[in-house]
From Swiss-Prot:
It comes from Aspergillus niger (strain ATCC MYA-4892 / CBS 513.88 / FGSC A1513). Component of a pre-mRNA cleavage factor complex. Interacts directly with PCF11. Residues 1-23 are annotated as: Disordered. The keyword Nucleus applies. This is mRNA cleavage and polyadenylation factor clp1.
């Protein structure tokens, strides 16, 4: 099966190549093995002796792990033996571990006094290791029995969802070594317990689109949901929050500090971790260090914000546009088709003879009458357009939400995603904008003459009568 736009094809098994011979290397304590694997190829790693971890999650002995389309590092505290090609002895893992222990002290204090646990915000430039640090702190927290709430505010990379989303998830169990954060129920069964993410749709890379009004509104709704969860879940309240952010917020652009301030206020942040940017660290120190938090108990407990500077790992590598596009396509493929490992021997840089079991899913295809759907366009006004054409009072923003029933189906809709919201099909545009997401449809084909679209859905049955959001870049219209 092949779908244009996502290159959804099974790799050919016509050619066979001999796998690379395995090589065993002993890693000294406090060192890490850094590796990069292209999409379409795999590398298999087995821990032979000692202990090791990937972003805080321990590797099981004699278990083969398979990686594809990733850039990561395996670290050992006490030394280990595995099959490796490169060993790095300069690593900030001790620094990151100290952050974990400091957060644990705050969590113990929160449990003893009945206060909320630490709320951590991670800032830094693009490709500085922010998400990796989020995984490490989350994995260490779950390892000692904590249940952190993890928030992803970076729309370019989905967490337990597709790209173009902002999510929040409670982690009660370990993180999946091979699949990063793990999998949601929409990705099928998993050896590691699945997570239940709360998902909001934000299909743009820049949080400052439309002066940041749309992004701010979604952040506020996400923060409200997280705060409500902490109020009802004692374990989550004691453990606190870990918030990952997009690297674009660290740039010297007007509105970035205001956006960071909005995030700090909405989530009542107590600790700001700045990775790899002296300039950003100075700005955060000036604006937030030792300032009272925005929590309701801040006045009574004299709770104040701490700003901490962390080193950027030497293992961080730049991810170009082509790689990020491949990441996005891979996440979308995984959402609908599962995560099958390429079956060709030519694709495998095999360091072990054994393999792991991955799940292949079969999405349900159906044809829909486009005009029968309550589809909302998500368009951004260009600088040349007349602002008088928009009604900011309707949405609190200059963005336009137009019901799909009044529009003809557009061929540009092909190979795009539709987000099914929890909002009613008759809800107001503002409610549709702020609604969380139920699931996604992939538009495989468009018949403009008949007004029909063929979509793929992760589950069978009729599409629920809910408002649906799509994104059209105004520069391409």
């Amino acid at each position: 099966m092949s779908l244009p736009g996502l290159d959804l094809t099974q790799p050919s098994a016509d050619r066979e190549f001999a796998p690379a011979p395995p090589s065993q290397i002993s890693l000294p304590k406090g060192s890490e093995w850094r590796f990069e694997v292209a999409f379409g190829t795999t590398v298999r790693v087995k821990l032979l002796a000692g202990t090791a971890e990937l972003f805080g999650t321990e590797l099981a002995p004699s278990q083969t792990y398979t990686f594809s389309g990733t850039k990561a590092a395996i670290y050992t505290w006490h030394g280990c033996t595995l099959e490796s090609e490169y060993v790095a002895e300069e690593t900030p893992m001790v620094e990151y571990a100290n952050v974990h222990f400091a957060l644990e002290t705050l969590r113990q204090e929160a449990k003893a006094t009945g206060k909320d646990g630490p709320r951590v915000l991670i800032l830094g430039p693009e490709d500085a290791g922010k998400t990796s640090l989020s995984k490490i702190l989350t994995a260490y927290a779950t390892k000692v029995g904590r249940q952190p709430l993890v928030v992803n505010l970076d729309p370019t990379e989905g967490m337990l969802s597709v790209p173009g989303t902002l999510t929040a998830t409670a982690f009660r169990t370990m993180i999946d070594v091979e699949e990063g954060w793990g999998s949601s129920p929409m990705s099928g069964p998993s050896a590691v317990p699945v997570k239940l993410p709360l998902v909001y749709f934000y299909p743009m890379q820049n949080p400052l689109e439309a002066d940041g009004s749309v992004y701010k509104a979604i952040v506020s709704r996400l923060a409200l949901s997280v705060t409500g969860r902490m109020a009802e879940d004692e374990d989550a309240r004691e453990t606190g929050i870990i918030v990952d952010t997009p690297g674009i917020l660290s740039q010297s652009k007007a509105g970035n500090v205001e956006m960071i301030n909005h995030i700090v206020t909405e989530f009542a942040i107590t600790t700001i971790l700045v990775i790899g940017s002296e300039r950003l660290y100075s700005i955060m120190m000036k604006n937030f260090d030792n300032k009272p938090t925005a929590s309701a108990s801040a006045a009574a407990s004299d709770e104040r914000i701490s700003v901490v500077k962390l080193s950027k790992s030497g293992g961080c590598v730049d991810r170009d546009a082509a790689f990020m596009k491949a990441v996005s396509e891979s996440q979308i493929r995984t959402y609908f088709f599962g995560n099958p490992i390429p079956s060709t021997a030519s694709a495998a840089l095999s360091l072990s003879a054994s393999s792991t079991t991955n799940v292949t899913l079969s999405p349900h295809a159906q044809q829909l009458d486009f005009n029968a759907l309550a589809v909302y366009n998500y368009t951004i006004a260009s600088a040349e357009e007349d602002e008088d054409e928009y009604d900011p009072s309707q949405l609190g923003t200059g963005d336009a939400f137009l019901p799909g029933g009044s529009n003809d189906v557009d061929l540009a809709l092909a190979n795009s995603l539709l987000a099914i919201t929890h909002a009613s099909s008759t809800a107001s545009p503002a409610d549709v904008r702020d609604a969380s997401i139920m699931g996604f449809l992939y538009v495989a084909d468009v018949d403009a003459e008949k007004g029909k679209i063929r979509v793929l859905a992760p589950v069978g049955g009729r599409v629920p009568p809910r408002a649906i959001k799509k994104y059209i870049d105004s520069s391409k219209v």
